[in-house]
Amino acid sequence: MSEFSEPACRVLRPLTNYNGKQGLTYIEGIAAETVGAKGICMHLLTIPPGGRAKAHLHERHETAIYVLDGEAITLYGDRLQHHVLSKAGDLVYIPAGLPHLPVNLSGKPISAVITRTDPSEQESVVLLPELEAIAEEKVAALKSAKRHSVLT
């Protein structure tokens, strides 16, 4: 019998870090493994200055993000041809199957609460190594544009 077989409210103190397939370090949260979740996971993420995830998608699961602090650019699309800027207080939605990656171009960390409809969190993560060269080009262009806007 599982330790989560009886329905109960559970409180989790997020203390344990783990490395996600995406190349970022997450703080463990609500998941099938920690509380017996059946249809959702929630964890904390901090992206350091200059950090970014690997290009990836979540095969069958949607993602909702609440940005606590800092600002991130999320590249997305089949060729990472689009991007959105999110700042503290913003909510971000990423549909299932959409290639994407967050990047921190600022000088301070980004903190966010990440929620997915994947109770095992990393289960449906699919890395997209074929997009990494494109990601590097896009990030370099964004850095250049940011430097240029600061100088003008």
What are these language model-derived features?
Residues R52, H61-A88:
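A short beta-strand-loop-beta hairpin characteristic of the jelly-roll/cupin
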Residues Y26, M42-T46, A64, H83, ...:
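Conserved hydrophobic/aromatic beta-strand scaffold that supports enzyme active sites
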Residues L44, L57, Y76-D78, N104, ...:
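Residue-level recognition of conserved beta-strand positions in structured domain cores
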Residues K87-A88, A96-E123:
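Ligand-binding loop in jelly-roll beta-barrel domains
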Residues M1-G39, K54-A55, L127-T152:
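A short, N-terminal "cap"/entry segment at the start of jelly-roll beta-barrel domains
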Residues E28, H43-E59:
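Conserved short histidine dyad/triad with adjacent acidic residue
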